[in-house]
């Protein structure tokens, strides 16, 4: 019980220390990533598969990389669990909203109102196996990404310049995204949608490439945010709390 109280206190201090905009973007990206994953992307080859979740999934990893570099992998993982819990709460809200009798604005197509309305309810309400798969996949990828990022930082010769930040971010994001995509594909797409193992692996690899490229594009702004945090001593309360609790 004392351990639980300690963890709750630690997380509460952490949430006060992480800039609110960063945490907000992180949580919003996790929620929208899972919602957009309902739409697949048409690709020219049958063995390739991607969904629209890749539009924002890179933002989740960018936030995790910045938090990991400044606060450490445990803090980034705790923030990830908070994002997951908020996402589960929003999924419950979406599910309840989908069960409320009514008509969606986009369903007003003569002769197809009921079909379109039902499809929109199904998309917003979601299904248990997609939610389960996406939750497990994100938790696994967050842990892999955060601790890989931290480990790469420890072996880097110069851990304060952009080159070092970019190296650890690109590699950890690539590995984390591959784990995310593959875990989701194996749990959901392979079991429920009939994807072959080849499609699962290719989807994971293709998504990893696309999302890592997004990380490359936006990594420099992430690095500048990190420098601003360091300059303004962001997270002082958290660091002092962790130092005191370690004694």
Named regions from a protein language model:
Residues 118-137, 141, 154-160, 168, ...:
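Membrane-embedded alpha-helical bundles of multi-pass transporters/translocases
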Residues 173, 181-191:
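A structural feature that tracks compact, well-ordered secondary-structure segments
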Residues 2-84, 88-89:
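Hydrophobic transmembrane alpha-helices
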Residues 76-82, 162-169:
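Membrane-interface alpha-helices at helix entry/exit sites of multi-pass transporters
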Residues 87-108, 138-146:
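Transmembrane alpha-helix/helix-exit interface in multi-pass inner-membrane proteins
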Residues 97-127:
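Membrane-interface interhelical connector segments
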């Amino acid at each position: 019980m004392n351990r639980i109280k300690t963890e709750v206190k630690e997380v509460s201090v952490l949430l006060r220390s992480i800039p609110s905009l960063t945490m907000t973007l992180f949580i919003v990206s996790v929620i929208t990533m899972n919602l957009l994953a309902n739409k697949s992307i048409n690709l020219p080859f049958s063995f390739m598969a991607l969904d629209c979740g890749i539009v924002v999934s890179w933002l989740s990893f960018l936030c995790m990389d910045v938090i990991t570099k400044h606060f450490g992998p445990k803090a980034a993982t705790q923030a990830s669990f908070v994002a997951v819990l908020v996402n589960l709460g929003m999924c419950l809200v979406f599910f309840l909203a989908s069960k409320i009798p009514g008509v969606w604005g986009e369903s007003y197509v003569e002769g197809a109102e009921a079909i379109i309305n039902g499809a929109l309810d199904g998309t917003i309400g979601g299904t248990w196996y997609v939610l389960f798969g996406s939750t497990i996949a994100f938790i696994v990828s967050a842990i892999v990404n955060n601790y890989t990022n931290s480990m790469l930082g420890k072996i880097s010769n110069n851990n304060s310049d952009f080159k070092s930040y970019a190296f650890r971010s690109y590699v950890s994001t690539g590995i984390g995204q591959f784990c995310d995509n593959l875990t989701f594909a194996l749990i959901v797409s392979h079991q429920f949608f009939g994807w072959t193992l080849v499609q699962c692996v290719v989807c994971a690899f293709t998504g990893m490439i696309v999302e890592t490229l997004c990380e490359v594009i936006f990594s420099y702004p992430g690095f500048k945010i990190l420098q601003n945090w360091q300059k303004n001593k962001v997270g002082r309360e958290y660091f002092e709390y962790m130092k005191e609790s370690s004694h």
